[in-house]
């Protein structure tokens, strides 16, 4: 019943109007899985390769027909006839056929779309929801939790056309008792933030991830605006709602000078100075998580940052680790950061994603499941977060269907699982137990 009989790849459009790969995997019993690959803007240099056509006459060179041809041709040929329930085998076959270190022959966008579509088809064949199938693949059947959302309500950096250098200012509705309540709190703060920004004569257009993208005089001003919005919504900052930031520091690191340049503020810092700049913000505001607080290659700086702040708050590696077990293993050995951001298109298959989550958890690191800035209506990351009991999710703000699709799927899953999927709030965040 779970033998693969047909594989289809197609070019669809993502939330930024760029093409991406969608795949369908059809099984013997008439079961079908469909999934689409997301795409990042601030990408780590060691991510698996997203294959683009480079043909300037189509989609400004961003077409994905080569990746789609790989799905419809060589990938389909090798996995047709195989058992979709054996996810590790399906992924391994594709990885071996690609034969490159970073999936550059077929593209991680091709391999991932098929990998996820295969998992969805297998779940359908087993007559179970995707999160339940993922929990079985993860070796943790029936073990679920609802993730604490990190909601990106002010966008800067590569995600917005403004003067704010830090890429994401996020809220975590830690006072909520359920995921559904967390979404409500997030929505109320989001709408109150619009009022706060409007009252200051600021723009309330949204960035790629659905957060506002105003011009602000400093990063601290973004935090101050959020604090005002939280209070305006009737919540207590630090008790009901905590803060998180994604610096995406590689984007403002000057490799020539070795300095971190906050152009919006007209300031530049050495590596250790930037750590202390961030530490200063954490003393002023209840920031419990900082992602990519330094450049991905600044491992000495990260070791120092972890020493200074790692005992008190969650330090998440995104560009730093790129969901790659080899790099994560080295980071764990060297005591770099204490959490990993999980983006399955950074590594390019479900099996490798599950391996990264397991490695992190075994080492006492937390794992934060994440969207990309280029998304589709595909909500697989919601099932991934619940099925691995990862505990935290980053999937944007309270606007744009490409973001909200994930929250809505989490609401459905929570309704289905009830007490079997507890919402643990702040307890999920490293250093906040």
Curated annotation (Swiss-Prot):
It is found in: Cytoplasm; Secreted; Cell surface. One of its GO terms (cellular component) is extracellular region. It catalyses: (2R)-2-phosphoglycerate = phosphoenolpyruvate + H2O. InterPro entries: Enolase, Enolase-like_C_sf, Enolase-like_N, Enolase_C, Enolase_CS, Enolase_N. Transmembrane segments: none annotated. Pathway: Carbohydrate degradation; glycolysis; pyruvate from D-glyceraldehyde 3-phosphate: step 4/5. Belongs to the enolase family. Component of the RNA degradosome, a multiprotein complex involved in RNA processing and mRNA degradation. This is Enolase. It comes from Edwardsiella ictaluri (strain 93-146). The lineage of its organism: Bacteria, Pseudomonadati, Pseudomonadota, Gammaproteobacteria, Enterobacterales.
């Amino acid at each position: 019943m779970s033998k693969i009989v047909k594989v289809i790849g197609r070019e669809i459009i993502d939330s930024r109007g760029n093409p991406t790969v969608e795949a369908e995997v059809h099984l013997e019993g008439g079961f079908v899985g469909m999934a689409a690959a997301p795409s990042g803007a601030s990408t780590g240099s060691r991510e698996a390769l997203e294959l683009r056509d480079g043909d300037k006459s189509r989609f400004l060179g961003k077409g994905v027909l080569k990746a789609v041809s790989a799905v419809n041709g060589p990938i389909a040929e090798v996995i047709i006839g195989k058992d979709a329930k054996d996810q590790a085998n399906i992924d391994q076959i594709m990885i071996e056929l690609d034969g490159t270190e970073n999936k550059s022959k077929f593209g991680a966008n091709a391999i991932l779309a098929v990998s996820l579509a295969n998992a969805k088809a297998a779940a359908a064949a087993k007559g179970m929801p995707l999160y339940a199938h993922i929990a079985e693949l993860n070796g943790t059947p029936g073990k679920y939790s609802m993730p604490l959302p990190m909601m990106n309500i002010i966008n800067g950096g590569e995600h917005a056309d403004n003067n704010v250098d830090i890429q994401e200012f996020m809220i975590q509705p830690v006072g909520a008792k359920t995921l559904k309540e967390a979404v409500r709190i997030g929505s109320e703060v989001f709408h109150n933030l619009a009022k706060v920004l409007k009252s200051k004569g600021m723009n309330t257009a949204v960035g790629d991830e659905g957060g506002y993208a105003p011009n602000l005089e400093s990063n601290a001003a973004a935090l101050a605006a959020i604090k005002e919005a939280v209070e305006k919504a009737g919540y207590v900052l630090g008790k009901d709602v905590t803060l998180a930031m994604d610096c995406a520091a590689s984007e403002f690191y000057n490799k020539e000078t070795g300095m971190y340049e906050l152009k919006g503020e007209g300031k530049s810092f050495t590596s250790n100075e930037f750590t202390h700049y961030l530490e200063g913000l954490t003393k002023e505001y209840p920031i419990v998580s900082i992602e990519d607080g330094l450049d991905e290659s600044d491992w000495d700086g990260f070791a120092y940052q972890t020493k200074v702040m790692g005992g008190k708050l969650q330090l998440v590696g995104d560009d730093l680790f790129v969901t790659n077990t080899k790099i994560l293993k080295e980071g764990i050995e060297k005591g770099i950061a204490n959490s990993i951001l999980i983006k399955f298109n950074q590594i390019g298959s479900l099996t490798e994603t599950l391996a990264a989550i397991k490695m992190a958890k075994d080492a006492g690191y937390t794992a934060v499941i994440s969207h990309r800035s280029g998304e589709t209506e595909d909500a697989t990351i919601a099932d991934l977060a619940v099925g691995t009991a990862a505990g935290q999710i980053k999937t944007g703000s309270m606007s744009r269907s490409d973001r909200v699709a994930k929250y809505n799927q989490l609401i459905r899953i929570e309704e289905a699982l009830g007490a079997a999927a507890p919402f643990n709030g702040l307890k999920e965040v490293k250093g906040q137990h």
